[in-house]
Amino acid sequence: MGKRKAFIDKKASQSFRLVPDNRERSERFKPTQEHLEEQQKYGVYYDDDYDYLQHMRAVNEPMKLENVHEEVEKTTIKTSGSSAFPPAPPLFGLVGALKKPEFFDEDVANALEEVTDDRNTGELEDNFITLAGGLLDERTTVYRSTRRGEDSEEEEDDDEDDEMYDDYNDDELFGEEAVGEIRVERADQRVIDNAFEELMDREYNTDQIGELDGDDYDVGGALEPNAGRLHKLINDKGPSNAEYDEELAKHYVRERMRLIEEGVIKDKEEYEIVEVDEGTNKKMKWDCESFATQYTNIYNHPTLIKEPRGLSRKALKRFDKAVEEMDIAEEDEDDDEDMEDDDDKESVFSTVSTFRPKNETPEQRSLRKKAVKEARKLRRVEKKANKTMFAEEKRKLAKGRIGQIKARPI
């Protein structure tokens, strides 16, 4: 059974979406022709029963904020003097409606006030050192300061160490050698700190210490030729172009000399004025030998062009013998060709035709075919003779070129 053609083609059809409309027929908007023209003026081309212009506002039209919350009228409820609700029933033997008298103790209140005063003020007593247990030994102070410098992030461990070492004697904890090493390290650190402070006072002012201003990002200074920062800047620049660098250097020298001549800048160096011929700048003058040496390398060895030498006596004798042998061979070939030319003077041409006459008999047909075969055979022989003759002429020309000097017209 073949495939049935669909009643509706989905690709070539239009689909519509039905949306419910809760409005009544009398409330629906019916656009007029003027309304549609005004709507198309603002780029709205929808042809439906909706007023799109109701969302349009003028540029200078003030905005008005509408309150989205519903207003609720305030209502007052009048109650009688006596309570409208009866008191709550007693719960587990306790009377909730009755209020017991509060207990007040003056000593407790004064103690609480003193505690709150101490917490709020944060002031210390005049004799807080004696209250804390007196001054500590210098060795214990040095040890604690070094330990806190190493573990500044772990405050809880520092507190535990302080409590642990308060109960022990200092002589038992530290020997004389350990205390001496701590004092030496502290002395070295103090020397470094003093040198750093002197360097800061000498190199920088108080105004130059700290973060730079908002727009002051220019940092001046001089770099050494072999400084690592200078090499890094060169590498960041990337591969340099030799021609571009040369042109940039020339431009810098020209601008600097111009400013020196105008007196804008002063230069302590002394320069010597040298006159240069203008013709040498435009085109360099080279002779053949000096110019050829500019491109000499391991692959190219330019030299002066020399005239070819003449043949030696031995070479001339060999050349004469070769010419005589070629002449003898050419004479023999010419004799053979003259004899062959006598036979080939008459060209073989076809006198028969492959066309069959209208009233041809079988005997005439067989004779005609034999004549055609004979003519084709003679034609093949003629072609072979022509091919052989052209090959011989080509060999003669090749032999004639032997010993000739190749020359090119000037």
Curated annotation (Swiss-Prot):
<dbReference type="GO" id="GO:0030688">
    <property type="term" value="C:preribosome, small subunit precursor"/>
</dbReference>
<feature type="coiled-coil region">
    <location>
        <begin position="363"/>
        <end position="389"/>
    </location>
</feature>
<feature type="compositionally biased region" description="Acidic residues">
    <location>
        <begin position="325"/>
        <end position="345"/>
    </location>
</feature>
<dbReference type="GO" id="GO:0005634">
    <property type="term" value="C:nucleus"/>
</dbReference>
<dbReference type="Pfam" id="PF04180">
    <property type="entry name" value="LTV"/>
</dbReference>
<feature type="compositionally biased region" description="Basic residues">
    <location>
        <begin position="367"/>
        <end position="378"/>
    </location>
</feature>
<keyword id="KW-0175">Coiled coil</keyword>
<dbReference type="GO" id="GO:0005829">
    <property type="term" value="C:cytosol"/>
</dbReference>
<feature type="compositionally biased region" description="Acidic residues">
    <location>
        <begin position="151"/>
        <end position="165"/>
    </location>
</feature>
<dbReference type="GO" id="GO:0000056">
    <property type="term" value="P:ribosomal small subunit export from nucleus"/>
</dbReference>
<feature type="region of interest" description="Disordered">
    <location>
        <begin position="142"/>
        <end position="165"/>
    </location>
</feature>
<dbReference type="InterPro" id="IPR007307">
    <property type="entry name" value="Ltv1"/>
</dbReference>
<protein>
    <recommendedName>
        <fullName>Protein LTV1 homolog</fullName>
    </recommendedName>
</protein>
<feature type="compositionally biased region" description="Basic and acidic residues">
    <location>
        <begin position="357"/>
        <end position="366"/>
    </location>
</feature>
<comment type="similarity">
    <text>Belongs to the LTV1 family.</text>
</comment>
<feature type="region of interest" description="Disordered">
    <location>
        <begin position="325"/>
        <end position="378"/>
    </location>
</feature>
<dbReference type="GO" id="GO:0042274">
    <property type="term" value="P:ribosomal small subunit biogenesis"/>
</dbReference>
